[in-house]
Amino acid sequence: MNEKKQSRLRRAKSTRLHIRALGATRLCVNRTPRHIYAQVISADGGKVLAQASTLDASLRSGTTGNIEAATKVGALIAERAKAAGVTKVAFDRSGFKYHGRIKALADAAREGGLEF
């Protein structure tokens, strides 16, 4: 595994340990060059309460690897999380920089009503 990926995974592990210590429900984000995924995971880490990604039928028709798509995923995850009864989450960016698509998803989720 290359050094850049190892550093990202180390940051992700550290963040997840901190969130687990808080006992908070987390909004976990993962990105690939082509897609972006978001899950709301329960505080114990055992259950996915809501999920959204660019693979969803409603979002798949457009482009999937850009900031516009990440914004749509953020709005969709906020809507689904609220439907599941979740309003407060800890943002788990999986070690990715808070920039670009990750930032766009987080901003859209906040506008959709999720509290970080």
Swiss-Prot record:
Q: Which InterPro entries match?
A: Ribosomal_uL18_bac-type (IPR004389), Ribosomal_uL18_bac/euk (IPR005484)
Listed Gene3D superfamilies: 3.30.420.100
What GO molecular-function term can you cite, just one? structural constituent of ribosome
Q: Which cysteines are joined by disulfide bonds?
A: none
- What is one term from the GO cellular component aspect held by the record? cytosolic large ribosomal subunit
Q: What does the record list as GO biological process?
A: translation
Query: Which UniProt key words apply to this protein?
Result: Ribonucleoprotein, Ribosomal protein, RNA-binding, rRNA-binding
- Origin superkingdom: Bacteria
- Family affiliation: Belongs to the universal ribosomal protein uL18 family.
Q: Which NCBIfam families does the entry mention?
A: L18_bact
Subunit (UniProt): Part of the 50S ribosomal subunit; part of the 5S rRNA/L5/L18/L25 subcomplex. Contacts the 5S and 23S rRNAs.
Q: What does this protein do?
A: This is one of the proteins that bind and probably mediate the attachment of the 5S RNA into the large ribosomal subunit, where it forms part of the central protuberance.
Tell me the protein's name: Large ribosomal subunit protein uL18
- The coding gene here is rplR
